């Protein structure tokens, strides 16, 4: 009997000990979650895309340049500009990698934005090799994939300005840049605007470039920040530190070349090694505001939308 009693007591003590440990673990988990939520709320949050203009941010994050600048930056990945817009409109991010047409439209709708950084964002208008389209005037009655209210919408109009086609050109909204590329590779679209590195992938598959955005001599890529979310002394300090880390990432990219960071391109742009090796040389610039003439051209396009 005594032996059974001892066993029961030992079992009860063991259960009590396990219960206490479970409570301690739960308490620590809640405390850790609370700390992380607080850190996340205090961090500078940026909406990014799987495109080459975001690479300085990925370099700064993965190579701890933000940490060296003593700023906590969280990069929130999206596949479409529209989703980035939703994030910055809702205030879940402080900044967004975008283009001037989109951001000027957001400003027209009442959102206050500032542009401390111009990015090397460029697109290429690429036609499906099976469509045998070699010139812009052959796009009549064809579908061109782009994003409405964006730089690619603007560039489509610019490219076709003064061009006589046999019929109307259909601008088709495909927001997700990875889906857009997939549609080209599967021969589901006649033509489309693609940024890097997606444009390089398309070229490797022998699809034809009929016009690059560089022809317009405009730089539309920007990193935009919500002015009203950066009013406190701490947020302003964070932005300054962010720019410092960004510039350091740019220096590293220009010194060592994009090939040195091929792993980051693979990781964040969801591409392949063959594409990474074939990407043309890109020069990244320190943080500078966009040219006023480029802002005005984007503004002038807005009333058409």
Language model features by range: what are they?
Residues 130-137, 161-162, 167-170, 181, ...:
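Proline/Glycine/Serine-rich low-complexity intrinsically disordered segments
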């Amino acid at each position: 009997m005594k032996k059974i009693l001892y066993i029961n007591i030992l079992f009860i003590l063991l259960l009590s000990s396990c219960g206490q440990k479970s409570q301690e673990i739960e308490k620590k988990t809640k405390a850790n979650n609370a700390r992380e939520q607080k850190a996340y709320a205090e961090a500078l949050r940026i909406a990014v895309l799987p495109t080459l203009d975001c690479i300085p941010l990925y370099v700064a994050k993965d190579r701890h340049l933000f940490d060296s600048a003593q700023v906590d930056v969280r990069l929130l990945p999206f596949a479409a500009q529209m989703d980035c817009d939703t994030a910055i409109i809702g205030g879940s991010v402080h900044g967004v990698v975008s283009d001037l047409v989109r951001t000027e439209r957001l400003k027209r709708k009442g959102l206050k934005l500032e542009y401390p950084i111009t990015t090397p964002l460029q697109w290429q208008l690429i036609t499906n090799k099976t469509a045998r389209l070699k010139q812009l005037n052959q796009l009549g009655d064809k579908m061109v994939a782009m994003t409405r209210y964006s730089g690619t919408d603007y560039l489509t109009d610019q490219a076709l300005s003064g061009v006589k086609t046999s019929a109307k050109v259909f601008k088709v909204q495909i927001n997700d840049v990875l889906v857009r590329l997939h549609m080209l590779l599967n021969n589901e679209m006649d033509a489309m605007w693609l940024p890097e590195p997606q444009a390089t992938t398309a070229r490797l598959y022998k699809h034809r470039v009929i016009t690059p955005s560089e022809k317009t001599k405009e730089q539309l890529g920007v990193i935009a920040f919500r002015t009203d979310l950066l009013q406190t002394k701490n947020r302003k300090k964070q932005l300054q530190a962010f720019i410092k880390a960004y510039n350091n990432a740019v220096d590293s990219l220009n010194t060592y070349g994009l090939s040195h960071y091929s792993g980051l391109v693979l990781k964040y742009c969801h591409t392949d090694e063959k594409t990474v090796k074939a990407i043309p040389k890109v020069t990244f610039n320190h943080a500078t505001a966009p040219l006023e003439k480029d802002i005005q051209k984007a503004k002038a396009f807005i009333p058409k939308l």
